[in-house]
């Protein structure tokens, strides 16, 4: 179901307006208008679009914040990419065998933004560097004149006319930028290492998630219980990423952006084997990137004059 929310914000002309309180950001987004200060040098016009695909198990919640700054010679747009990517973790008999069970799980979550418009350039994005912490919190701030800066966390010591924050959890995973240029950015949230009953294991360990019940007929029992799986494997991932783009004023009225959410899937096989003495045990075998780019891509059209957002296509 497509939702469209419109908010208009007028910001103070002061160059040192207080940093927006990120804890109030979501609550404010529910209002029709948001008054931050007097003056009209900067106007923030907001749109929100929601798109869901049951086929891909993905929901995109995209916030489009148009920055109308009289002291900046370009149009600017802040895109905050949120939503949910289901893990799609599944368990099954491998090729109808009785002694090999399979677990398909997300080794990597994909989040990407792309445009082919020659008048549009990517000027900033979050996160930028490889991040290994479980909880990720960063802020992108804007000051009059087209100055975008990032603060390290939600409590960053910055003073901005306007700011936008990201916050997400990635237990046992790491975030890094895989590709970036003037027209696109692609992040990968990748499995890293896991604490197990037998000690710390690499995400590439062939026995990762293999269980201890070789006599069960249920494929699920060949692998560790849900209580030993991190949220990004058991249920899914809630992304929160930001990209900022500029647009040449007086050029094109509209631009198109492709936003992609998805996953790369690994398959772990649990193989029932027997010792020389007849005792059964489970042996792991791993297929890395067995299914890649299982992605949901939505094409959004942005109108720089009317500030309308249209969905032009999806896979």
Curated annotation (Swiss-Prot):
UniProt keyword Secreted, yes or no: yes
Signal sequence interval, chain numbering: 1-29
GO molecular-function terms, A-Z: toxin activity
Superkingdom, taxonomy of origin: Bacteria
Cellular localisation: Secreted
Keywords: Cytolysis, Hemolysis, Secreted, Signal, Toxin, Virulence
Statement: the UniProt record of this protein carries the keyword Glycosyltransferase: no
Pfam families: Leukocidin (PF07968)
Any single GO BP term: cytolysis in another organism
Signals that turn on the gene: Less protein is secreted in a secG or double secG/secY2 mutant (at protein level).
GO CC aspect terms: extracellular region
Subunit organization: Toxicity requires sequential binding and synergistic association of a class S and a class F component which form heterooligomeric complexes. HlgB (class F) associates with either hlgA thus forming an AB toxin or with hlgC thus forming a CB toxin.
Function: Toxin that seems to act by forming pores in the membrane of the cell. Has a hemolytic and a leucotoxic activity.
Similarity section: Belongs to the aerolysin family.
Identification of the protein by name: Gamma-hemolysin component C
Organism of this sequence: Staphylococcus aureus (strain NCTC 8325 / PS 47)
């Amino acid at each position: 179901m497509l939702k469209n929310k419109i908010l208009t914000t007028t910001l103070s002309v002061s160059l040192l307006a207080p940093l927006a309180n990120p804890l109030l950001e979501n609550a404010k987004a529910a209002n029709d208008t948001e008054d931050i200060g007097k003056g009209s040098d900067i106007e923030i016009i907001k749109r929100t679009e929601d798109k869901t695909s049951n086929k891909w198990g993905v929901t995109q919640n995209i916030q489009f914040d148009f920055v109308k700054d009289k002291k900046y010679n370009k149009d600017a747009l802040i895109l905050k990419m949120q939503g949910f990517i289901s893990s799609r973790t599944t368990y099954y008999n491998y090729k109808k065998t009785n002694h090999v069970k399979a677990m398909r799980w997300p080794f990597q979550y994909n989040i990407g933004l792309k445009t082919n418009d020659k008048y549009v350039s990517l000027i900033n994005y979050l996160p930028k560097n490889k991040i290994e912490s479980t909880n990720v919190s960063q802020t992108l701030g804007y000051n009059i004149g087209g100055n975008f800066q990032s603060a390290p966390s939600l409590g960053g010591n910055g003073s901005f006319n306007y700011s936008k924050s990201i916050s997400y959890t990635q237990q046992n995973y790491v975030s890094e930028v895989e590709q970036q240029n003037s027209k696109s950015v692609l992040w990968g949230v990748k499995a890293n290492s896991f604490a197990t009953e037998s000690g710390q294991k690499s995400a590439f360990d062939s026995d990762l998630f293999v269980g201890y019940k070789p006599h069960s007929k249920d494929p699920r029992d060949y692998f560790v219980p849900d209580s030993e799986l991190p949220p990004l494997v058991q249920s899914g991932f809630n992304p929160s990423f930001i990209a900022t783009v500029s647009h040449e004023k007086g050029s094109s009225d509209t631009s198109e952006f492709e936003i992609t959410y998805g996953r790369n899937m690994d398959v772990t096989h649990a193989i029932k084997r027997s010792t020389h003495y007849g005792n059964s045990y489970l042996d792991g075998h791993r297929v890395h990137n067995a299914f890649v780019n299982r992605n949901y891509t939505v094409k959004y059209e942005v109108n720089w004059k009317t500030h309308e957002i249209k969905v032009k296509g999806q896979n």
